[in-house]
C-alpha cells in the first residue's frame, strides 16, 4: 500500500515536471528573421494583460527586441485584447490597425509607421516570428498602444505589459 502511494506521488511529480519544462521549451523555440538571417530568440518571454486579464500564452509570447516589447498583434490585440480592427495587404507586409477612431499602418521589416496619416519613425520594425509551427506577426506594443489610444504600462520586474481600455465590439 505504501509503495502505491509513493508511485502515485512520483508519477504526479513527473507529470508536473514534464509539463512545466515542455512549455518552457516552446517559449524558448522562437525564431524570427533579422537582416535576412534567421535568429533564435534566447531572451525572456513577456506576459501581456488587457484590463487585468492575461491575453497571451507561452506559444504567443511577448519578446524584448532592441529594447522594445514585441507582441503578436492578432492574438493579443484583435482576438483577446481590446478588439482592434485590422486589415492586411500585400501578402501581410502592410498591417493596418484601428481602434476608437485612431489608426496605425505598419510595414513588415520597416522602421516607420503611419499614425493617423502622419509618417513616424519607430525603433523596432514589425517582423514575422515562429513559435514551433505557429507563425506570428510581432508589433511594437508601446508604439501600437500609444497610437491607438490604449493605456500601456510596462513592469520590468514582472516581465509584463498591461494594456487598459474599453473593448470595442464590432458587427462583423
Sequence positions of predicted segments:
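Primary recognition of N-terminal secretory signal peptides and signal-anchoring hydrophobic helices
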Residues: 4-7, 23-172
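Bacterial N-terminal signal peptides that target proteins for export
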Residues: 2-14
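Hydrophobic core
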Residues: 15-23
